[in-house]
Amino acid sequence: MKHKRFLFLLTAAVAFIIQLIDIISYTIKFSITKTFVLIIIQMIGLVGYAYDARNVVKNKRRMFTILQSVAFFIYLINLTYQLFLNPALRHVKVISSVNISPLKTILLYYTAYERHTLPIKNIILNMIGNVMLFMPFGFFVYVLFKPMRSFLPYFLFFLFMIVGVEVIQYIWKVGSADIDDIILNMSGVLILYIVLKIPFIKKLF
């Protein structure tokens, strides 16, 4: 059993180190798919360790808190990299722009779909990606920080954070400031909050 737990942790650690090399190195750059696979491997390693150790560790709550914190740390590194440091963003000549008209970009996607100027796959990935981007953040914040289980602190925290991300991306020229991104990002964390408040799910935390 100890060997199995060690293998789970080793797997997660190796995947994490490989990803750090990808982030730090100027020559080795993985595709989004490979990065996603590495993240999944890390999470499987942590979950596998927790599952295998569930009957051995006396203070299970503390163990899960530590594992959740580690998973949160891994997520934050990946999120920061993808939002601000990904070289792919630097290689693209971004036209800095600001959109403060709600649903303007979303309607542009719809128009592009109708005119067949943009594949539906790209549109769906972009829309769903924006909705899901901060959902893991919402989960970790809700679970690890009790004040965030109240709606107002949770809502205000993510509103200011997501607006801040848009502003920084605009200033650093790694994206445009778009209110539709804020709407989609906020929709994701609010949907997650509602799900976490479902009685039988709420009991788990």
Predicted regions located by residue number:
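Extended hydrophobic secondary-structure segments
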Residues: G175-I179, I183-S187
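Bulky hydrophobic segments
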Residues: M1-K173, I179, Y193-F205
